[in-house]
């Protein structure tokens, strides 16, 4: 009797395991940044359900510090918030085994101001707020160099820091802040310009195309990506999510949500 009961329990566990596996194949947990990017991901979620029967569970984050850690430790199946230079730096810094498995959008970084309309109006000693994470900090410095506001060491690559500045003719004060804080400092009387990723613009009502003082050009290497663990890159639910994200429905929604500030990176 005990043997029979044990066999029945084992069979039940095996069946439960099979059911769970089947359920997971049609379920994916994806990390996104709260706000506009999550709004876009909601459209991908709808497409995934309609086209593939895939249930997408979106997990919102307020900043860029936690999604990769959660993905690396299996708390998320994938995330959608970063570009390749950011991923490379995070993998190197934390020993993550994360890989890019698909492109999403290029979100141009640009300089915004409530005080000036052009670079020519920027006064000596002005304060410019930039992101403080290594890759977007470097991206902002390269943008400032492109506007001839600073000069950087030759061959500095994509990850310059303030220590790589070799010339600062206007003696600009460069303030490093968490990316999510940058839209709020536009109203700070001490800040003249904030360099902000399109990701964090929704709350401001600003358009990178129409409202920026200066902006990255179309050749930016910073296309955003879908990221997962190396051992999960061939999972069917990941492939179906990518196909759902890279859809006309998502591209159209992003065009509206980001007011023209999201360029599809898969076309």
Task: Show where each model-derived region lies.
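C-terminal motif of bacterial Sec signal peptides marking the signal peptidase cleavage site
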Residues: 14-17
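Short, polar/charged alpha-helical segment
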Residues: 27, 34-59, 66, 70-72
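Beta->alpha turn/N-cap motifs
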Residues: 35, 62-64, 74, 78-88, ...
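Short helix-initiation/N-cap motifs at beta->coil->alpha
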Residues: 58-69, 156-184
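Pocket-flanking alpha-helical
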Residues: 64-95, 110-112, 117, 140, ...
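A conserved helix-loop-strand patch within extracytoplasmic ligand-binding domains
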Residues: 101-151, 251
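Periplasmic-binding protein-like
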Residues: 102-113, 138-145, 202-267
């Amino acid at each position: 009797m005990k043997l029979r009961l044990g066999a029945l329990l084992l069979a039940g566990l095996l069946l439960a395991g099979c059911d769970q596996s089947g359920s997971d194949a049609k379920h994916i947990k994806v990390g996104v940044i709260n706000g506009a990017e999550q709004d876009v991901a909601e459209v991908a979620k709808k497409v995934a359900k309609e086209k593939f029967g895939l249930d997408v569970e979106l997990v919102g984050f307020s900043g860029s510090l936690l999604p990769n850690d959660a993905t690396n430790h299996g708390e998320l199946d994938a995330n959608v918030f970063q570009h390749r230079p950011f991923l490379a730096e995070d993998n190197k810094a934390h020993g993550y085994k994360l890989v890019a498995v698909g492109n999403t959008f290029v979100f141009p970084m640009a300089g915004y101001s409530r005080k000036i309309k052009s670079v020519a109006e920027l006064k000596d000693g002005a304060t410019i707020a930039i992101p403080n994470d290594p890759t977007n900090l470097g991206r902002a410095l390269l943008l400032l160099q492109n506007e001839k506001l600073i000069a950087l060491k030759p061959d500095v690559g994509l990850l310059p820091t303030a220590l790589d500045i070799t010339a600062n003719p206007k003696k600009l004060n460069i303030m490093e802040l968490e990316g999510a804080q940058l839209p709020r400092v536009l109203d700070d009387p001490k800040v003249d310009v904030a360099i902000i990723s399109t990701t964090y613009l929704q709350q401001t009502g600003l358009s990178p195309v129409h409202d920026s003082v200066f902006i990255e050009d179309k050749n930016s290497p910073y296309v955003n990506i879908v990221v997962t663990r190396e051992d999960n890159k061939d999972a069917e639910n990941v492939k179906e999510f990518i196909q759902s994200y890279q859809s006309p429905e998502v591209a159209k929604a992003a065009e509206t949500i980001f007011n023209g500030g999201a360029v599809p990176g898969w076309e």
